[in-house]
């Protein structure tokens, strides 16, 4: 499930973020158009993450959306600062642009466990690569084409970033940065 988490308002030299407490799901129509609440999404900024983890599902197993828990909290706290110091801030036109959170693989590769480090991280990465190479990469490209983004920012974890880079680096205004979960360390607060 991909979601709009807010809007970037571009006015001159500074981009401000309007965030919502509620995120809005993106629907992909059969004609290749991405919509939110029945309206076409125009010129969004797309943030690529890896796959949904345990925090992104409710107690009954229904998806809540990308970037929940620490990742979402750090994204909310630092994204405005980082987007304003990135190369993306120089290329997006004036106006409002939706910020769309996209999991590159739509399946829970962590299998209900916290993929922090060690064996859980390794198993999660192996599962992600299996899914990505078995059609997840094609699905990601279809969703990005439907969104027709003004910019794409790859914030996948380091171990998976290269796989995603190889598939989507041809999109205009493509850049990358560190995963939001690592943004609590100042040296990792960066979007190129």
Task: Specify the residue positions occupied by each region the protein language model found.
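Active-site and ligand/interface coordination hotspots across diverse enzymes
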Residues: 1-71, 142, 146, 187-192
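Glycine/proline-rich loop-helix segments at beta-alpha junctions forming the active-site rim
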Residues: 2, 108-192
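A structural preference for short, hydrophobic beta-strand core positions in alpha/beta folds
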Residues: 30, 101, 176-178
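Short secondary-structure capping micro-motifs at structural edges
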Residues: 32-35, 61-63, 80-92, 138-142
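Short loop/turn segments at strand-loop or loop-helix junctions that form parts
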Residues: 45-53, 101-112, 156, 181
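Membrane-associated lipid acylation/remodeling enzymes share a hydrophobic transmembrane-juxtamembrane segment
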Residues: 69, 73, 153-154
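Short, surface-exposed acidic-centric catalytic microdomains
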Residues: 72-119
């Amino acid at each position: 499930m991909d979601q709009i988490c807010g809007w970037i308002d571009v006015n001159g030299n500074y981009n401000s973020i309007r965030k919502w407490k509620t995120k809005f799901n993106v629907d992909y129509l059969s004609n290749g158009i991405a919509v939110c609440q029945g309206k076409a999404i125009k010129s969004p900024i797309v943030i690529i993450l890896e796959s949904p983890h345990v925090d992104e599902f409710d107690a009954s197993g229904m998806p809540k959306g990308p970037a929940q828990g620490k990742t979402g909290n750090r994204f909310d706290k630092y994204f405005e600062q980082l987007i304003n110091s990135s190369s993306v801030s120089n290329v997006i036109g004036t106006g409002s642009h939706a910020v769309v959170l996209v999991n590159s693989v739509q399946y829970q590769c962590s299998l209900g466990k916290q993929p922090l480090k060690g064996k859980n991280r390794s198993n999660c990465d192996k599962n992600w690569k299996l899914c990505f190479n078995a059609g997840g990469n094609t699905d990601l490209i279809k969703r990005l084409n439907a969104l027709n983004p003004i910019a794409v920012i790859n914030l996948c974890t380091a171990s998976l970033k290269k796989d995603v880079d190889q598939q989507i680096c041809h999109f205009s205004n493509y850049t990358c940065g560190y995963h939001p979960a690592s943004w609590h360390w100042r040296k990792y607060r960066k979007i190129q």
